[in-house]
Amino acid sequence: MLDAIAAGTRQVVNLGAGYDDRALRFRHSGVQFFDLDLPEIIADKARRLEALDTDITRVTLAAVNFATDDVADVLARAGHDAQQPTLFIGEHLVLFLQPGDVKRLLAGVSSHAAKGSTLALTAEVHPAGLDSALIISTVDDVMFGGAGPLHTIKARDAWLNQFKQHGWQVNNANEVTAVNHFGLPMTDQPVQIQAQFLTATTVCLG
């Protein structure tokens, strides 16, 4: 984030921000932050910030349901300038969204991504050659007893292709930056699921 701001980015959109306080910790003159999350979370966050008498002049709290809302519309109503470069952050978000919702999210973000924008996303990745639906089903059964909240885990190439389809080029695509998230008991040996950190820049408007 600090590198993006130092490079001239003047808008930061935190997708699924929750109670993240980076908009306050890293505030800079001339930089507008947009924190997006579910309506109940945004309402509670606003109440807490007001109770603390926190200056949120440069912070816009915007309610969104990623399963039903168009992120592009939410950003437009919040005052985001689609003609100016933006840093979009999505940490530990897409794992909890259905694949169709992830696609719609990326499309909405891309439509508001001016040239020079950056997308920093945490994506859950399984080894190549495995069936993503089977992975999700196994996660659901083994970890959550059939009531799992995790919905989108893909092979790295699938993530790279999806980024490309929406006008994003992953930086240093051959270099993997990741942490091991959890293992699954499948076939002859456990399958390791990673949380990979993907940073991409716009190659065209979405």
PLM features per residue range, with description:
Residues M1-G206:
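Alpha-helical subdomain
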